[in-house]
């Protein structure tokens, strides 16, 4: 198998490039846009020449205060380091494109699995606890400026299935931040940091309307497999997943973003509740982010409403439906222009066939099956405090209703307090 790198040396080298000059001049640490600054002018010069370094850290601490499995705390973290090569600037060419290289590392412990027992992760950055290559891609326009093509090794969720505005990452639960989880839970769809070989096309009809189409390899054996961390080619390709997405962005007045999407994975899958195979599985989704109010007295202060509705294959997906809605207030106070207040509600519906299988297994073993609701529900409230241009602190509270809806376990509703720390390196 082709391996891009054999160990963590690439991640350490990239981290060293970003962090070594970090504190050469720490006097402006509270004012600069990144923690490590401009590296004595080197960083800006490299970007002007066509090489842009980026780095992001997120740390999430959660404490289960009531209900769930037990009272305790857990911490998880994500470190992302990347470099973008602008070939136009580097070689003096026109429309030569860009190359993106990204490495990711995750560490920590599972708040949902250890403390709550629910399906929707209370830490959006938990999972796949190892260092990996997460993107090696090439992007450029083709034939016309309206058509953008990207190909290589990348997470399909980087460009599809989520709101471009990023409004949902004002929350810490993975049910909100990212993409509807029934996409990846019931097909070959992959979200960051899981990457696959693929190609993505974007065609802009005008500034408001766009269509996106992609095709990605499906390789279940590489999911969460640290031995595949640096391998680009699939270990065992079972099929191809093809998403199609229509995007509308309201640009005048109160801004808005709307996405209507469909996807299909032609891999064979086992039908839930039997040994039969299903030829393919798919789903569809609707996403929206709409500003509904904007202050006339305070520039930048606005109230947004968001919504998600997603359905997956009823034959082969254990996670059949996801709905969410909520509000985000930007600039809650005149003195806090970059802060946010977010309140959201989500409902995750397990496949009824999965519940039937759980009930049948319990009866076959002479056990009673608990009386459970037909969905796991989530209420989350957070406050995003922009401490410096590069540092965000987000205290958070989550209330998980029916945590055992997916596992078929009788678990008390859980109250979880959390703190998310995000830093641009």
For each feature predicted by the language model, list its residue ranges.
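Short loop/turn motifs that connect adjacent beta-strands in outer-membrane beta-barrel proteins
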Residues: 25, 30, 37-53, 86-99, ...
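Signature for the C-terminal beta-barrel architecture of outer-membrane proteins
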Residues: 182-313, 329
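Residues on the lipid-exposed face of transmembrane beta-strands in outer-membrane beta-barrel proteins
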Residues: 55, 81-85, 136-140, 199-203, ...
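Outer membrane beta-barrel transmembrane domains
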Residues: 226-235, 245-247, 261-278, 294, ...
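Outer-membrane beta-barrel "beta-signal"
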Residues: 411-425
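Transmembrane beta-barrel strands of outer-membrane/channel proteins
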Residues: 55-61, 99-105, 149-155, 213-217, ...
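Outer membrane beta-barrel
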Residues: 72, 76-220, 317-321, 331-357
